């Protein structure tokens, strides 16, 4: 029985990782490519960051999806290994904290706040745009993405 649960969890995580990656890759061919990386980020896939509240497999799924996306698109971002490693770890931490949230409203905060304050460190450094300006750009884009997806969540997850 435990193997079935593990297989089920891995499958769900893989589906979420794939969906995240596909959404990021799709965005790079749409007219919104410049919003995928940089001081203003509006990633369509970031709407998925509220999924850990409903599904524990979303925690590793989002991490792997972000990691794969950042690897594939590292040539576009210009941030290299720091974005691949640190960006993916920020997503993992945000997903974990989202999973622990007591309500869907609190669940929206970790991806918005952590991406805003942490990802802005290297984006600001490499882009030359002031840190707090970058924080506002990344937090704003993250908030838009997350708030669009939040209505699909149940009121609270046990």
What are these regions (language model features)?
Residues 25-38, 47, 67-158:
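Membrane-embedded alpha-helical hairpins and interfacial helices in multi-pass inner-membrane proteins
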Residues 2-6, 63, 127-132:
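Juxtamembrane loop-helix boundary motifs flanking transmembrane segments in multi-pass membrane proteins
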Residues 9, 13-17, 57, 61, ...:
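Small-residue packing motifs within transmembrane alpha-helices
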Residues 53-75:
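Membrane-helix boundary elements
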Residues 2-57:
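Hydrophobic transmembrane alpha-helices
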């Amino acid at each position: 029985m435990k193997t079935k649960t593990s297989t089920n969890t891995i499958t769900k995580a893989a589906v979420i990782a794939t969906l995240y990656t596909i959404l990021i890759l799709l965005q790079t061919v749409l007219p919104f490519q410049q919003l995928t990386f940089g001081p203003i980020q509006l990633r369509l896939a970031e709407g998925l960051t509220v999924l850990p509240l409903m599904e524990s497999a979303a925690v590793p799924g989002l991490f792997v999806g972000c990691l794969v996306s950042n690897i594939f698109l590292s040539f576009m971002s210009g941030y290299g290994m720091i974005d691949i490693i640190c960006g993916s770890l920020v997503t993992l931490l945000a997903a974990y904290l989202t999973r622990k949230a007591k309500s869907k409203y609190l669940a929206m905060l970790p991806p918005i706040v952590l991406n805003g304050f942490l990802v802005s460190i290297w984006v600001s450094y490499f882009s030359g745009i002031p840190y707090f300006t970058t924080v506002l750009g990344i937090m704003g884009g993250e908030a838009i993405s997350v708030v669009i997806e939040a209505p699909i969540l149940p009121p609270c997850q046990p």
